[in-house]
């Protein structure tokens, strides 16, 4: 039996990719709590300049990731997903190490851009698992996989702040590089993929990829949904701490309260994502997606009228439980409506839309709050999500029957 015919243990691959997504999510969020402090340490002074450069070094990673993702997705479809996971983990490890050696803000900005160019571990992990799991378990598996990055993102800021306080800012970058290198080793030795490389001349062009889809308009609507999910999340991020401070009044532990309220949606998503993914496998991910979007709207509106941090925290916990279903449902529908031959590009296109949302969301939130106040941000975000719920309902209505009955290509 050839290596290409050897059965794949998809459960082992799911476990290892979950761990890889956890380490990647932790690595990225390790440096987030002190990013403005590191910018200041590199010589940027003055309130306006510090805000500008902090925003630039944060956003440029997502911007370059959006640009590079389709290229890496095409390469994954041609060369295999495992090699893309290895490239991403090792590349990000080297870049993180170099960040710890940066001597000025321009070097750091360039390295943040390079980090975006070399990233892509999580979308390639999704593509790998999507091509290996039994189709009737797609929702559960992708929901479970999504909790890896969420778990890492929750733990990262806590660990990063502790490490920075005790060993300094630069040391955290070196530790982050080590974490990513461990991710590389796990991927190298524990992930298995049977992939036959495809000649470049046999690869479909981007136009041919979309022409090959049974429902290209549906797939495009799923990309838009991913963008809006990130816009909705990112629009609240810049004003959350300030909004909590307004609600809490003069208290000494505002940072702790804000951190808790920022974290509770992720905790709720950890609990809900696998369960709602399994439910989606039974009743259809399109139903889960629409209901979760509507619930999100109904929870965002009262956030504009809360009077205490506790009220806001409860609503954000419930919002996180609903949000835990959104991206796994989108990813499952992408699996149902594409083939394994193009899954790398489909997931990379989706990642590009997410990255665009990550860039534009904070800009929208900051602009709305500057002109209309903190409370208006939640109403505007609710309006954006409501539009998405209506748009998704119309897009999913006609092809819902096909989307919930995946049988377009075989899996191991």
From Swiss-Prot:
CDD domains: MFS_MdtG_MDR_like. Its main location: membrane. One of its GO terms (molecular function) is transmembrane transporter activity. It is found in: Cell inner membrane. It comes from the Bacteria. It is a multi-pass membrane protein. The chain crosses the membrane at residues 19-39, 56-76, 90-110, 113-133, 144-164, 171-191, 222-242, 254-274, 288-308, 317-337, 376-396. One of its GO terms (cellular component) is plasma membrane. Keywords: Cell inner membrane, Cell membrane, Membrane, Transmembrane, Transmembrane helix, Transport. HAMAP family: MFS_MdtG. PANTHER family: MULTIDRUG RESISTANCE PROTEIN MDTG. Belongs to the major facilitator superfamily. DHA1 family. MdtG (TC 2.A.1.2.20) subfamily. This is Multidrug resistance protein MdtG. It comes from Klebsiella pneumoniae (strain 342). The gene is mdtG.
